[in-house]
């Protein structure tokens, strides 16, 4: 999800998103090198007027252009596999958040606390304040402590949705009758925006997600005040 006047990925707010950005840059460098090499060879052959009548095969060059792509794929596959295992690893979460997708809003439950659950609707344009973002702000934000491991359980009640926060590197499908889970670690305070990333009906574009990251002390105060 791009932001205003920005062609790059969003600034990361978690270690996993940093690793995703590093992998993206790593792969992009390899692709640029391949593009330059292939482009140079094609242009050279296009302007080359020499003909060799007797060169029917070249085992060495065939061996080279078979091995080089394999080595290139290894350089892409190894960091990718490492990142996949990191994204699936779940280590002693402090808090479990349950997210339930509906047409067209989200419900949240803090499973570790009693009676902390709420619905989160997009703020309509006619009710927006001057500091709200159009189609992104909600009436009830998710409040989470930074510098702690968070587990999120995602499901849906009607159709398939997808719970996504780009700056945290999180995208989890919400399937009816199924509970998916992932984890993330927010390493700085702030407000982070996301949206449903699976087409789920007429108002698919109007079910944003907002996370407010605060210190653990302020989070405890928020829990006490909410209770």
UniProtKB/Swiss-Prot annotation:
This is Cytochrome c oxidase subunit 2. It comes from Choristoneura rosaceana. Mg(2+) binds at residue 198. Binds a dinuclear copper A center per subunit. The keyword Transferase does not apply. GO terms for cellular component: mitochondrial inner membrane. Component of the cytochrome c oxidase (complex IV, CIV), a multisubunit enzyme composed of a catalytic core of 3 subunits and several supernumerary subunits. The complex exists as a monomer or a dimer and forms supercomplexes (SCs) in the inner mitochondrial membrane with ubiquinol-cytochrome c oxidoreductase (cytochrome b-c1 complex, complex III, CIII). Its main location: mitochondrion. Its EC number is 7.1.1.9. It is an enzyme of class 7 (translocase). The chain crosses the membrane at residues 27-51, 63-81. The gene is COII. Keywords: Copper, Electron transport, Magnesium, Membrane, Metal-binding, Mitochondrion, Mitochondrion inner membrane, Respiratory chain, Translocase, Transmembrane, Transmembrane helix, Transport. Residues 1-26, 82-227 are mitochondrial intermembrane. One of its GO terms (biological process) is ATP synthesis coupled electron transport. Disulfide bonds: none annotated. GO terms for molecular function: copper ion binding; cytochrome-c oxidase activity. It is found in: Mitochondrion inner membrane. PROSITE patterns: COX2, COX2_CUA, COX2_TM. It comes from the Eukaryota. Residues 52-62 are mitochondrial matrix. Gene3D superfamilies: 1.10.287.90, Cupredoxins - blue copper proteins. InterPro entries: CcO_II, CcO_II-like_C, CcO_II_C, Copper_CuA, Cupredoxin, Cyt_c_oxidase_su2, Cyt_c_oxidase_su2_TM_dom, Cyt_c_oxidase_su2_TM_sf. The lineage of its organism: Eukaryota, Metazoa, Ecdysozoa, Arthropoda, Hexapoda. It is a multi-pass membrane protein. Its cofactor is Cu cation. Cu cation A1 binds at residues 161, 196, 200, 207. Component of the cytochrome c oxidase, the last enzyme in the mitochondrial electron transport chain which drives oxidative phosphorylation. The respiratory chain contains 3 multisubunit complexes succinate dehydrogenase (complex II, CII), ubiquinol-cytochrome c oxidoreductase (cytochrome b-c1 complex, complex III, CIII) and cytochrome c oxidase (complex IV, CIV), that cooperate to transfer electrons derived from NADH and succinate to molecular oxygen, creating an electrochemical gradient over the inner membrane that drives transmembrane transport and the ATP synthase. It catalyses: 4 Fe(II)-[cytochrome c] + O2 + 8 H(+)(in) = 4 Fe(III)-[cytochrome c] + 2 H2O + 4 H(+)(out).
């Amino acid at each position: 999800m791009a932001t205003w006047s920005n062609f790059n990925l969003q600034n990361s707010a978690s270690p996993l998103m940093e690793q995703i950005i590093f992998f993206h840059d790593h792969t992009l460098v390899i692709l640029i090198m391949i593009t330059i090499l292939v482009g140079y060879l094609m242009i050279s052959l296009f302007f080359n007027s020499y003909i060799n009548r007797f060169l029917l095969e070249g085992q060495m060059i065939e061996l080279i252009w078979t091995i080089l792509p394999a080595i290139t794929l290894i350089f892409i596959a190894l960091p990718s596999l490492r990142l996949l295992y990191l994204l699936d690893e779940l280590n002693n979460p402090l808090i479990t958040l349950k997210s339930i997708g509906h047409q067209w809003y989200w419900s949240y439950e803090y499973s570790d606390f009693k009676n902390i659950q709420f619905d989160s609707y997009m703020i309509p344009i006619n009710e927006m304040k001057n500091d709200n973002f159009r189609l992104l702000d909600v009436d009830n934000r998710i409040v989470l402590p930074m510098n702690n491991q968070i587990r999120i359980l995602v499901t849906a009640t009607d159709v398939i949705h997808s719970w996504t926060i780009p700056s945290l590197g999180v995208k989890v499908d919400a399937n009816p009758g199924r509970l998916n889970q992932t984890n993330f670690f927010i390493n700085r305070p702030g407000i982070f925006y996301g949206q449903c990333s699976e087409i789920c009906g007429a108002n698919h574009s109007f079910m944003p997600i907002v996370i407010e990251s605060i210190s653990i002390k302020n989070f405890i105060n928020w829990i006490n005040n909410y209770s």
